[in-house]
Amino acid sequence: MKKLIQNIKMAGLMAMALIAWPTTITAQSAKYDAKTVNAVTERFVAYAKINSQGTDTSDMDAFPLNPGQREMARKVEADLQAILRGTSATVTRSESEYVYVKIPANAKGIPSVMFMAHLDVTPEAPGGNITPVVHRGYDGGDLHLPSGLVLSPTTPQGRHLAQCVGKTVITSDGSTVLGADDKTGCTVLVTLIERITRNRKMRHGDIYFVFSQNEDIGRAADRFEAKYVGGGSPDLVIDIDGDAPTHFSVANFTAVGRTYRFVGKEAHPGDAYASKYGDVLTAAAYFIGQIAPQKHPSASRGEQGYIHCYTMTPVVTTDGESSTEVRVRMRYFDKLEGDTLRTMLNDAEASVKTAYPNVRVEATPEVLQYENVAYSMPSSLTQLIVKSAK
């Protein structure tokens, strides 16, 4: 979220809290009646059924939008127009399919706030023909999904079920992603907008809402338009994306992306030495293998950073050359650890050049996707956030 972070810093915002990552503070939980639960469930299911998966690309100037992403934006826009009809609030859908809402202040001297969620879903799992399955009054046992998959509270994947006994649990049918990241956030914000505008007694400053696109490919900030949110200068920004209910994260991973391309000449293996064969597949695999297992995401706990080589893709080339592209994520809380991870990647690149001299390595510049909000958030704000949540 590089540009958004820049906008936030330039505007001198008080804070940005990401509800997504390990460092959390806890606000008071609330109980809701069956009517509210049913309404929220229906809204979420309707959103989850829309396949709004993004499409990742190494072209950092591109901003791909799939038909489902456009459909999701139009659905949220239509729901909000119905909710806000007859009020002073405004709804705007931009050319980039972001949806913006402004609820004007009805009292003076109250800080402004902006809430955010994203409309897209990760492209890294099957996402077509999503079938949400609603499990009401969960009894604490195994969930048997239509695909044959069993979700058990005794497994790492189902460990959160232990806190859901007696509640409504929603899953996919087991053959696709559900898309709760971030259809949950979208559902929460649309419901919040409904609550605010129906509560005539609530006194508030300007309240803004942003439903962004392509967050899951690290580009939510690329088409963010500050003109729709008071010039980009609300006093507090809260992103609804990920963590457990009532948890507010006040620190998060800094996210950096980079792409490495391995290029070499094609040749028959029997004539590889004389022809200076550049085996790009093996070179790319060698590069990935240079990253210490201790720095793999599966070894990361809490605030430990990691390097994730998450795709390896052949690329069409000409002039008798072949190419393989490896996309890499770096995640870290501490800036010094980030420097250590960069050194590891640089060493891995150098080792490929030594081991496979016929392969050319081309690395794109780093792309800062979003930054740890703790770098710029005043510590005094944590209790303010809790107080606001209550």
For each of these PLM feature ranges, what is it?
Residues 161-253, 299-318, 326-333:
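Acidic/histidine-rich catalytic neighborhood of metal-dependent amide-processing enzymes
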Residues 18-26:
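C-terminal segment of classical bacterial N-terminal signal peptides
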Residues 279-390:
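Metal-dependent amide/peptide-bond hydrolase catalytic core
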Residues 2-12:
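Bacterial N-terminal signal peptides that target proteins for export
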Residues 239-267, 272, 281-282:
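Phosphate/diphosphate-binding glycine-rich loops and adjacent basic-rich segments that engage nucleotide
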Residues 76, 80, 188-196, 284-288:
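Buried hydrophobic packing segments
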